[in-house]
Amino acid sequence: MAMTNEEKFKILADQIKITEHLDSEILENSELTRVDVKTSDRTWVFQITFPHFLTIENYLLFTGAIIEEFKTIADVKCNFTVKDKTNQDEFAIKYFSHCIDQTKLSPKVKGQLKQKRLIMSGDVLKVMCQNDVERDHFDKACNGSLIAAYQQCGFNISKVVFETDSAVNDGDLASLEAHIQEEDEKSAREATEKLEKMKAEKAKQQDNNESDVSKCQIGKPIQVENVRQIDSIIEEEFKAAVEGVIFDINLKELKSGRHIVELKVTDYTDSLVLKMFTRKNKDDLAHFKALSVGKWVRAQGRIEEDTFVRDLVMMMSDIEEIKKATKQDKAEDKRVEFHLHTSMSQMDGIPNISDYVDQAAKWGHKAIAVTDHNVVQAFPDAHSAAEKNGIKMIYGMEGMLVDDGVPIAYKPKDCDLKTATYVVFDVETTGLSNQYDKIIELAAVKVKDGEIIDKFERFSNPHERLSETIKNLTHISDDMLVDAPEIEEVLTEFKSWVGDAIFVAHNASFDMGFIDTGYEHVGIGASTNGVIDTLELSRTINTEYGKHGLNFLAKKYGVELTQHHRAIYDTEATAYMFIKMLKQLEALGVHNHQDINTSLSNEDAYKRARPNHVTLIVQNQDGLKNLFKIVSASLVQYYYRTPRIPRSLLDEYREGILVGSACDEGEVFTAVMQKDQSQVERIAKYYDFIEVQPPALYQDLIDRELVRDNETLHEIYNRLIRAGDVNNIPVIATGNAHYLNEHDAIARKILIAAQPGNPLNRSTLPKAHFRTTDEMLDELHFLGEEKAYELVVQNTNDLADKIERVVPIKDELFTPRMEGANEEIREMSYDNAKALYGDDLPQIVIDRLEKELESIIGNGFSVIYLISQRLVKKSLNDGYLVGSRGSVGSSFVATMTEITEVNPLPPHYICPECKQSEFFDDGSVGSGFDLPDKKCESCGCDLIKEGQDIPFETFLGFKGDKVPDIDLNFSGEYQPEAHNYTKELFGEDKVFRAGTIGTVAEKTAFGFVKGYLNDQGIHKRGAEIDRLVKGCTGVKRTTGQHPGGIIVVPDYMDIYDFTPVQFPADDQGSSWMTTHFDFHSIHDNVLKLDILGHDDPTMIRMLQDLSGIDPKTIPVDDKETMGIFSSPEPLGVTSDEILCKTGTFGVPEFGTGFVRQMLEDTKPTTFSELVRISGLSHGTDVWLGNAQDLIRSGKCDLASVICCRDDIMVYLMYNGLEPSLAFKTMEFVRKGKGLTDDMVEAMVDNEVPDWYLDSCRKIKYMFPKAHAAAYVLMAVRIAYFKVHYPLYYYASYFTVRASDFDLISMIKDKESIRNTVNDMYSRYMDLAKKEKDTLTVLEIMNEMAQRGYRMQPISLEKSKAFEFIIEGDTLIPPFIAVPGLGENVAQRIVEARDEGPFLSKEDLNKKAGLSQKVIEYLDELGSLPNLPDKAQLSIFDM
């Protein structure tokens, strides 16, 4: 049934939200008769019929609402018809002002007309004018347009007449016109207010609608049968449909107000970029916002080449979010995974442990283990993830187990080495397993008295075809073996030929394994002959060699080796090497076979042993500490190419640890391949559980021909299970997971491929995803259903139940103890306070000290203060200032104990003589350094100016219980001394560098991905490359150390209560050990001292040495020094000369282009303003787009904008906010959390201006005022030298802070240097980083030159190795300033010069080791005048 016009109107009224403003008659009886659509100019004309006239307010409201609703898609017009025109006269007058506005009259004419008196008579409207001139003017101007406007509103007006109004005088007319205008404006105002309210409600409703959209659905439904794999999208297409999971999303607003969404999706065959613009008048944006990474979508659209990304993209017409079935573990009884690698398995595991734990929890697993290679660095995150998911975490590691010593001689005999007979032999076989492979060639030579006296060479028939690998390796073909004798015959003959001689072989365990197994199978009795392994012998007596393979040793011993891997040739070469080795043994005093092992044993024997993988599982809390000790020892004491765990070490700390047999590289698996079952069972006895893994994880053994086939592999399973059963040891099935899902395998392939030396590159990587219970059962079905269930489910759950709950991270802070620390801190604070403020301390000083001491002592923080005080005191005693970082300057106790120079009290004067003081605590002064100079009224002495007005709460929190983080900036050259001093304070075994974990960065991952794809000859589009990069990013690559962090362990505990230890980046030559855990993981458990190295104290020390001026005596408010922060004039140069409007080049904190621009905008003149600028420059979203805009707009000045985090708390408290809320607000804002409703309410109630609230909302991070004050104090001192002692400053700057020198440019005249700088400015965007660094140096050099000083070339006679030296009005650069010349060479030049002058360039090269390139550079620089290429030989030298 067709919809009536009345129903159409109701729908329209509802859509434009106008129904509540219309009376019921209008709503019920109005009609929408039609809508005329003109596509040519996007015009919609609504034809509407009303039962009677609307009030002008409702008319304006209605038309405004309909235009607002459709404005984004059409230019809307309305034509109205009114059925009942009974009140037309009355409404025509009220509509007059609106109708005038619809004409094209000038604003002036419109304004005049609106004031006129009207008379309505029938269908004629009369407009009464003041005079004839006015009448004629209006009549001509309107020209029918007013009639059209009335008719559009539904009026039946046929004529508008302009008449002269003679009925009223001018005064009455003016009054009438004013009344008319007032009424018109009132009606328009009311309509506008209602419309704006409707708009606001609509916007709010849209926001609500957006928040209600939880699932994206735009456009038409997409047929599933049309969906294709993304890898099939290879060219432009009119229409295609794909589905995939979102791995990246970018939603941005365009200048037009529309939005564009860019999705990167993958279906794991490939990836594609999907794009879509929001459509006008649609809620697409809400749907876009419902999308997120990890959601699956189905999309349809046009495939086109995007000119910007130069790749195929889909321009979507339709998109819908879909539910994708995820893998479930549907087994009723779930397994427990005991072998799993995370991203902490270096360049091998992919996911974070939390990803595994989340998956296990979703599958319903009750527990899960983590067993990374050689490390336990995932433990902290594992603990957090397990607690979050309510799952039991089992902590473990896959380590490298080695025997403490590998024997050189087997079956020792009391036999003189010099007179013994030796049989040097070699076997070629069908494979590497003496249990499953066969001997195909046996060759030997007999050695006596240093000579080969006999040979033995036989093939044997294996009765099977050789693999291509064996043929290529041994150069033996099947034809060569067809007529060969049986192995029984060969071995029987061989045993007889050998007699009681001593066997010698290279890697004897392999060859003897085949001989012993062969003798046993043939039944001719076990061999009792002694054995010498030349591989292990060489490793012991040739420790200087990095390799010990047969090829390498043959060259070293001068022995010819042809056709390597043919038994007879290998044997002869080995024999000749062995003869020479015997002479080495004799030289070492080894004369008897039974003495070889004992005489040649050494502490490094573990290095020779072949590592076997082993799984170590923590059973209880004691086991955790023991594992920490094992990990530490393997990384520190027993590291050789990889961390190693000697068996004796494991035995010593085995309590509380369950030992598992690990993977195919474990000892038990290897034994199955190389030894008989009785030996396997004996070896298995050492373990607490035996592991078997799915056949897919052993597939590479078959691929590499180490295992013959699946049948052989199944036999290996049975022997492993038998070894467990015989010893009553549980056998468990483990997954050896390295990634979460099958499709993540590519990321591991890429990482492995990025490591050329990784042995995994030799084979196809096995499928190592995290398996469900049913997957494991299915893959082990060949064992039988019952046995598979036992290994996969029952035994893993039983083993998990034996493991206690273990907590790897402490939940409290353990600080070191220092006897009497509380009393010492209190006494020191008051003693120094009295020394500064007098015995009768001001109440403000007492109150602040007591407030702080109560928190410091009450929370056990005294020792932290005392440690910092000792470190600072030692540095000061040794002549180096210490700068403070962070918020420590907020603590007055820190000031009084000389930890920081920053005084946080309100600005004040102090008399150094009579100790009178005057405080300004009303916020009127920003810094005590800004107070005017003043003399003491009592004694006339110049008053000291102090105080930065910083609340204590910003350091230890509002309750004073936040652990203090005292960061100290020591001189970079003094930092090692400060670090070592902590060893004196606490003991070497109580202090460690804070460890860090370096992961694969996005840029590095991109290189890995591109390299892999190029090597494989694969082309992938950009979206897929981005996905692969994400998969590789975040994987552990190395370890390191915090630049200044020192971890202090209390004397009542040891480091293993918190973390294992290691060397940074496994550098065994490092002088410091680091925490194994990333220091953030234990930040709340142990004290961390931040003893950082910084250039400022080093530069201050050099300036002090050059000038003899104590930096503490420098006036902080020196006017000329302050002047350079707004102008270069105090330096005696102009802005044009140095190309800068300030004089702060090279001044710490104020020399960068970013901060110099801030200085230009703010023009600071005081210390407090510099502190504010420092805060602004170090914050995030504090200056740009925030304070800068406020200052430039004139709304604020530097003094009023938010600069440092403390500003917020202080300002809000001054404005009346309750202190705890002011503190909470500061904490929220400085961390980028914005403002809560209660904060906003309190701020508004206390009349905090709107701009302040907006500024707070924009801030992401804020700098502490104390940190800024400390930095600025150092900066002003250095700036003082720049102004008053220029050459001292420039010599110090170039020596301490500068690098990347362009000496060729620096030695030129000032105009040339200035031109060079100007030229680099013009090309700045194209400069490489190194060029930009050079530009920084040249800016300083230009300034120095403009001030009348110059740089000399390097002088062979005068230049130092590292320091710039002053000579007159010039500087002489050091040798280190030469590009590409390192520290060692720079020092060597000076040492060679001290031995005598350089006679020639050749002599310079010979004595100092300078390259030809460096010599040429020095020559170009003019540093080698008159130095010949070669020395001339004098007659007196002959």
Swiss-Prot record:
Gene3D superfamilies found in the cross-reference section: 1.10.150.870, 3.30.1900.20, 6.10.140.1510, Metal-dependent hydrolases (3.20.20.140), Nucleic acid-binding proteins (2.40.50.140), PolC, middle finger domain (1.10.150.700), Ribonuclease H-like superfamily/Ribonuclease H (3.30.420.10)
**Places the protein is found:** Cytoplasm
Molecular function (GO) terms for this protein are: 3'-5' exonuclease activity; DNA binding; DNA-directed DNA polymerase activity
Q: Which UniProt keywords apply?
A: Cytoplasm, DNA replication, DNA-directed DNA polymerase, Exonuclease, Hydrolase, Nuclease, Nucleotidyltransferase, Transferase
Give yes or no: UniProt keyword Cell division.
no
Q: Which CDD domains match?
A: DEDDh, PHP_PolIIIA_POLC, polC_OBF
The answer, when asked if ATP-binding is one of the entry's keywords, is no
Coiled coil (UniProt feature):
none
Q: Name one GO biological process term.
A: DNA-templated DNA replication
Going by the record, the broad EC class of this enzyme is transferase
- Please report the stretch or stretches of sequence annotated as the Exonuclease domain: 422-578
Q: Which reaction does it catalyse?
A: DNA(n) + a 2'-deoxyribonucleoside 5'-triphosphate = DNA(n+1) + diphosphate
Q: What is its EC number?
A: 2.7.7.7
A GO-annotated cellular component: cytoplasm
- Major place of localization? cytoplasm
Query: Its domain of life?
Result: Bacteria
The record's function comment reads:
Required for replicative DNA synthesis. This DNA polymerase also exhibits 3' to 5' exonuclease activity.
Q: Which NCBIfam families match?
A: dnaq, polC_Gram_pos, PRK00448.1
Q: Which family does it belong to?
A: Belongs to the DNA polymerase type-C family. PolC subfamily.
Q: Which PANTHER family match?
A: DNA POLYMERASE III POLC-TYPE (PTHR32294:SF5), DNA POLYMERASE III SUBUNIT ALPHA (PTHR32294)
Protein name in UniProt: DNA polymerase III PolC-type
Q: Which organism is it from?
A: Staphylococcus saprophyticus subsp. saprophyticus (strain ATCC 15305 / DSM 20229 / NCIMB 8711 / NCTC 7292 / S-41)
